Swiss-Prot record:
Expressed in testis and placenta. This is RING finger protein 37. Residues 226-249, 359-399, 456-479 are annotated as: Disordered. Its main location: nucleus. GO terms for cellular component: focal adhesion; nuclear body; nucleus. InterPro entries: RNF37_RING-Ubox (IPR039925), Ubox5 (IPR039847), Ubox5_N (IPR045696), Ubox_domain (IPR003613), Znf_RING (IPR001841), Znf_RING/FYVE/PHD (IPR013083), Znf_RING_CS (IPR017907). Its EC number is 2.3.2.27. Residues 239-249 have a biased composition (Polar residues). It is an enzyme of class 2 (transferase). It is found in: Nucleus. Residues 258-338 form the U-box domain.
Amino acid sequence: MVVNLCLPQFRPRIHCNKVSADGYEVENLISEDLIKRSHGFRTEYFIRPPIYVTVSFPFNVEICRVNIDLTTGGYQNVSGLELYTSALSSRVSQDAQDCWTTGPVETSVPDKEAFTLVGKVLLKNQNHVVFSHRGFKARPPFSPMEVTLLSPAVVAQELWNKGALSLSHVAHLKIGITHVTGSGISCIKRLEVWGQPARTCSQEVINSVLLIASESLPQDLDLHAPALPMESDCDPGGQSESQHSPCTLQDMSEVESDVPEEFLDPITLEIMPCPMLLPSGKVIDQSTLEKCNLSEAAWGRVPSDPFTGLAFTPQSQPLPHPSLKARIDRFLLQHSISGCRLLGRAQTPSAMTPSVITLPSRKRKTEQAEHSSHYSLGMSASSSATSPLFSPTTSEPTAKKMKATSELGLTDMDCSAGPVSHEQKLAQSLEIALTSTLGSMPSFTARLTKGQLQLGTRGSSACRRPASSSEHPRSVSGPECASCKQAFSSYSTNEPVYQLPCGHLLCRPCLSEKQRSQPMMCTACRQPVTSQDVLRVHF
């Protein structure tokens, strides 16, 4: 019996010397997440060979065979592979074995000179490679392995024995991608390293490996039964993980093996929900084409064919592929597995009960509107009863914000008083939009300020002297000084303006003259004024 040492239960470490693409990190090859493991590893499009992926084991192993799947959506990119091995010293390996039984261990990758070349292959239109060790023999308690029959599409290559430690005492395995076809992208779909613990491992490590291997494999399968061509398509976790996982790796591999290559996007390797036929004859998904166009636009280039680089013209444009779209939809309807995340598949849980999601938000909006309405009504009532129009040291933006808040409160009050028709709501929204737009114009602001000041002056005079206001009616054409009749405006005045307790305004020179004469009184209404009651106002 041999075990797949790349399973996450054995805590391997993996490293790549080049940058990987987003979502296709090298850690996907040994990840516990089945979705990530199905994505595999892929470098960025601008990375060129050589590329080295190093797998480090927490204990020394004896390699039986190495299976590498280089499938990239039907295109053969990788054409040259090399395999290297490295062995640690006995002291370091013994420490790693002791740490592996208690917790994870961080192994260090040796230098380039420490690796030994044990295998090399050149591919011609093949995507599966199997490196096998001819002299491998299973030791007790591991049972002898059966002969594995390889498929004709799989390239078989024997490993070279470069010494006693090159294949039987391996701590690090390095896979090198040396050549790719054309401008292809270097990638590894799946990686499996089958073997057993080395002879130098302690009995405790051997028992732990045997126990984990027995728990990982299904009980109805023999432990030494091989599979072809990739042997770890079963769920590597125990029964508890299989109960929580809605889609096993075996089901996923069956689906992926049944998916025709023409249904997969050659760039993202996903099923295309909306295939587009390019002028070059290639077919990609519409979302992939949009991402390519955005990437080109970021560099100031016009949309072009991702495969040829030729810009689109009115005569050569990407077109929908309705016949392929119909075939893809039929395939997705016939091959549906619960829990598998296929591109374009509708997610039913999020669309089950839309009312449950929308109703609470509507309720919160209604409560917030009522709260703001009551708050604005209370603020407007208290401000009209206790404070004048201008507050001390109140700037112009603050006054505009308070005015907008009061208008919003009055609008909410009108809406809550009774049923409002659509025409009334439209008129109110247009009026608010017009007011907010014209609020920055000087002529509109000056006219609005004059009307507000007139209303405020009359209201304050009526509150303080109702009898005198009725006896001496007065029409104010605009904010002006009560003594020298100088007009005030937020865009014309440069001098400070002061307000008397009676509500009338004075400029700075007139206020200085009033302070020299005792007793101090208002010129307009002849009310006595004290210096501490005079407030400075801002338009």
